Amino acid sequence: MEEYKTICFLVADILLIAAGTIYGWKFLKKRNYLLGLECWIVAISATNLLFSALLFSVPGFEGVSLTLYGNAMYLDAFSRAVGIPLIGMAGLMAVTHAYHPSKTADILWFAGGFAAAGILIVVAPENRHILGQFGESALVHAVESIKPWFYLVMWSLFSCFLLYFAWRLFKVGERLHGWSMLVAMVAGQTIATIYDFFEIPGDDADQTLFFIAALSTWAFLAMAMYYAYCAIERSKPATTLAKARVGQPYRTAGS
């Protein structure tokens, strides 16, 4: 049973790496750097998690495994706090609200996200020593205590936007993609709710069952977002698509 769970975990992780890499590249080809780079960040996080799991039991590589796991958790904090909820939302707004930020704005989105992730990681009990005496301050403890709720609120905001995104898909007749976004929204919100608050019955100390579900859900989300994005893009007038390809802002009725 344990071997079966391990295999399922590895398969789910590889699926997320593949989805993040492939659809990240596809978004980048559409010049949507927000969604493209965020998908790649998710893929890099999953890659670190994969090799951390593979090397954990290899003699002499325990330190490398822990470093890779730390990298994965930092990027996970980035994606949960800012990357998917805010950057993902902003990226999808390219086809719903004609939002096309400048390269400077793109950089600021990610710089702000990485800074926020750093704060969220450093307040964890195992990392507070980095802050010295300030690590035991009331402020640090307060940030750590509200962190799970912060993650949940941010993902819930993203789920609300996905509901709107699904409505836009139904509005243009893309029912299949509308339903795929609703499924992705429900699954993603379920994972976000379970993450810091509940345990799956029968799960082990490493939360293997949870991570199988989470990694699979995020892989599906990346795929569903890309094809839903393309579906709304197809509904735009030809002149709109031409402007989008050269990176010009565009407006359409209802945008």
Give the predicted meaning of each segment.
Residues 28-44, 101-110, 174-184, 237-240:
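Membrane-interfacial loop-to-transmembrane alpha-helix junctions, especially the N-terminal start
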Residues 53-67, 121-140, 193-205:
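Juxtamembrane "helix-exit" motif on the non-cytosolic side of transmembrane helices
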Residues 80-167:
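Membrane-proximal helix-loop-helix units in multi-pass membrane proteins
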Residues 36-61, 183-198:
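Hydrophobic alpha-helical transmembrane segments of multi-pass membrane proteins
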Residues 1-19, 151:
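Hydrophobic transmembrane alpha-helical segments in integral membrane proteins
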Residues 18-27, 52-64, 68-112:
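Internal transmembrane alpha-helix with an interfacial aromatic "cap," most often the third helix
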Residues 161-255:
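C-terminal transmembrane-bundle signature of multipass membrane proteins
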Residues 65-78, 140-151, 204-215:
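Non-cytosolic membrane-interface motifs at loop->transmembrane helix junctions
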